């Protein structure tokens, strides 16, 4: 068991500041869910963009965002104001994100476009608005996570802050409900005489505006009600130098590569509402309120699938702080990736064993258990990744005298965004292969609205192919990605004992610098 005796320090956040930070984190991640789940669903299933166009929009935007992250990290580390280096972006940035988020939903139905120029304009607006959203989101995302490193010097408090931040972000998963709410709002427009497709489009626009305004108000708490306590490096570095700093940091490089390898786990997140809406609710969440009353089958499956995912995620995040005090973070990380691959793979096995229909409870219950376990693994990895990246910041300061919090936490955003882009491209390739794309989706929506069954629907490539594609996407690629993710971190370069020694010495250095003395050396920990 690693030594866990880091010094306790007075420079740390108050309970009120932590509360403000968590509210802000919730608001920021609510916006992320509005776009990552709601906008993706809107582009794919409401305005019916072609599958490959959608995939390339998300992929190129995410790659561009990922490259922008270290650039933004450089700006953060060069920022010195009376509010600190992170808080200014969190005070003034959220309203800009709000405007761009709403603008992304103000688009037309691709299937209704009658001219080539009209179709090009719809795709172009989708691409431009999404790229702009990613750029504005980055301006606040890097400072928000970097704030945890400058709010406290205490290792335990920082780990606690990161864990609570991940939990707050997890609660923001309720943002996926934008799809259900939007479809409900859309049904009221349909009742007034609009076509089904136009009613759904307007329902999403109205709902997106409401969700985004609320999220922005909450997001502001992180900038307004926190305080920075740890000074950054006095030296400034170019973007190129910061890329070099990140890449030369061996433990960070291992985390970065591992995070990219497990990119396919994002497939479950970006396709979750598509699966719930089409596979379980036959294309419209409002089908839970059937003609003969409440459809208990749909409701139970929605609760099982959605509920178990969130419960598993929260459990994984919630138990990590305690487990990190008892076990090596590297071992916990590798365990979560390898064991976490199994429930993903078993989901597709259950789908095949059930003959393509896992809605009956005899299959639905074990399927939901797999969802629960995959959510727990993902929640655990989210916390571990954040804490391990924070450790890398200390490692860099100790090794080279450089503390670039913004740059290193931009790496976390880099992983998330690039992973989402890769997942979107994989998703679009599979959906494009089975024909779930463009006008075909519009035809599917009309057919389901007229009474067709999604599980047996034939869009031209074979009955049930759409359903099979969805189940494949949320299971097999994520299983492969999770298994591969353990390879880079199998021999992780920064043990917990060594990090504790490093942090103790850094605190001693800072205290000595303030007193004008030379810091005493902390004995090195023998390599394990």
Residue ranges of each PLM-predicted region?
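Membrane-embedded alpha-helical bundles of multi-pass transporters/translocases
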Residues: 2-528
């Amino acid at each position: 068991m690693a030594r866990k005796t880091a010094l306790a320090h007075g420079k740390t956040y108050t309970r009120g500041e932590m509360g403000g930070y968590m509210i802000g984190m919730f608001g920021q991640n609510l916006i992320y869910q509005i776009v990552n789940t709601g906008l993706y669903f809107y582009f794919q299933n409401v305005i019916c963009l072609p599958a490959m166009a959608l995939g390339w929009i998300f992929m190129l935007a995410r790659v561009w965002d990922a490259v922008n992250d270290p650039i933004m990290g450089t700006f953060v580390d060069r920022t010195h104001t009376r509010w600190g280096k992170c808080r200014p972006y969190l005070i003034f940035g959220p309203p800009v994100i709000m405007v761009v988020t709403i603008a992304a939903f103000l688009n037309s139905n691709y299937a209704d476009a009658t001219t080539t120029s009209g179709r090009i304009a719809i795709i172009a607006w989708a691409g431009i608005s999404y790229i702009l959203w990613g750029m504005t989101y980055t301006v606040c995302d890097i400072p928000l996570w970097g704030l945890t490193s400058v709010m406290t010097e205490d290792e335990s408090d920082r780990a606690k802050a990161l864990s609570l931040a991940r939990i707050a972000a997890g609660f923001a998963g309720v943002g996926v409900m934008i799809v259900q709410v939007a479809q409900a709002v859309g049904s009221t427009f349909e009742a007034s005489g609009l076509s089904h497709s136009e009613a759904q489009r307007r329902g999403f626009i109205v709902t997106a505006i409401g969700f985004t305004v609320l999220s922005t108000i909450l997001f502001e708490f992180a900038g307004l009600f926190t305080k920075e306590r740890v000074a950054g490096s006095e030296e400034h570095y170019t973007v190129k130098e910061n890329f070099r700093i990140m890449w030369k940091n061996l433990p960070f490089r291992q985390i970065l590569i591992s995070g990219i390898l497990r990119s396919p786990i994002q497939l479950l997140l970006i396709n979750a509402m598509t699966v719930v809406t089409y596979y379980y609710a036959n294309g419209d969440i409002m089908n839970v309120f059937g003609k003969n009353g409440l459809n208990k089958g749909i409701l139970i499956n929605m609760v099982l699938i959605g509920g178990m995912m969130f419960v598993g995620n929260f459990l994984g995040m919630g138990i990590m702080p305690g487990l990190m005090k008892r076990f090596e973070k590297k071992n916990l990380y590798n365990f979560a990736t390898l064991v976490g691959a199994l429930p993903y793979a078993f989901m597709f096995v259950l789908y095949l064993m059930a003959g393509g229909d896992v809605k009956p409870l005899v299959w639905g219950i074990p399927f939901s258990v797999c969802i629960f376990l995959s959510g727990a693994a993902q929640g655990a990895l989210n916390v571990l990744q954040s804490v391990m990246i924070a450790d890398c910041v200390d490692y860099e300061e100790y090794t080279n005298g450089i503390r670039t919090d913004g740059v290193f936490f931009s790496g976390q955003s880099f992983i998330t965004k690039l992973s989402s882009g890769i997942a979107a491209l994989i998703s679009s390739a599979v959906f494009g292969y089975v024909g779930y794309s463009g006008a075909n989706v519009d035809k599917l929506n009309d057919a389901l609205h007229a009474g067709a069954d999604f599980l047996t629907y034939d869009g031209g490539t074979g009955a049930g192919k759409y359903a099979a594609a969805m189940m494949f996407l949320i299971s097999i690629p994520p299983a492969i990605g999770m298994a591969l993710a353990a390879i880079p971190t199998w021999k992780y370069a920064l043990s917990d004992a060594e990090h504790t020694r490093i942090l103790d010495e850094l605190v001693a250095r800072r205290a000595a610098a303030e007193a004008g003395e030379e810091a005493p050396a902390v004995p090195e920990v023998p390599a394990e």
